[in-house]
Amino acid sequence: MTVLISPSTLAESIHAGKKQTVLAAFWAPIEGAGRTVFCSEHIPTSIFCDPALELSGVPSSEDGRNPLPPLNVLARSFRTWGLNTDREIVFYDQGRGLFAARAWWILRWAGMPNVRILDGGFQKWEDHELGHAGGPGNFPHFCNVRPNPGQLSVATIEDVKAHQGILIDSRDEQRFAGRSEKLDLKAGHIPGAININAKSLLEDDFTFKSPEEIRQIFADKGVTSGENVIVYSGSGNHSSQLLAGMEHAGLTGASHYFAGWSQWSANPENPIEA
């Protein structure tokens, strides 16, 4: 199953009436504002997804800033979205791709195999002038599936401490180097980690680079496979995007330290490099 779907291919499948569920993961810093943006304009046939409420658990120093959602929350979201085993799922966001990638990874982890990311998001859809709709969005279909977690590898903090392979920090270079940190308690990175900024896998329009280009980016850092690799970010967003890029490039098998730097840096006993 390919990770990405282009705006033109999605438009063709919508017009052809293909069985699929299109979900808009629209986030906004003010509660409820994401739904307001969605209701003003979205891709036809879309259903709204609230990343803060449906793709995250309760933040804590023990679990991280945006931990994985509890299974009861995810099961409720599956029903709200009307997920079905015979329907492909397509996620998109406003354009940067972080929340669509987060959704893609969480649903794959929860046992949904046919999940794709709209390459370039809603902004790329608009650039192609493919049309949009307003209002509350599509009515969900009957849901016939429940979350089945564990289908992708999750690394715990203990796994990271014991890891002898490659550890990748997917945040930007300033945060990795400890020169800037606006989101978490401390600046820096986990000792031994290398830095591959998730944004480096994207073109200027936030579409993914070609598989060949992405493989070269990883090869330049000594990474030629996803095996024995753990990826992290602050709280699961950039790391999900990096993992999507790795799968797009055929570098499969990496584990996801989802709690990431927000969990690691909250414990004063954990070592830090900067």
Describe the role of every protein-language-model region.
Residues 1-274:
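Cytosolic catalytic domains that perform sulfur/thiol-centered chemistry
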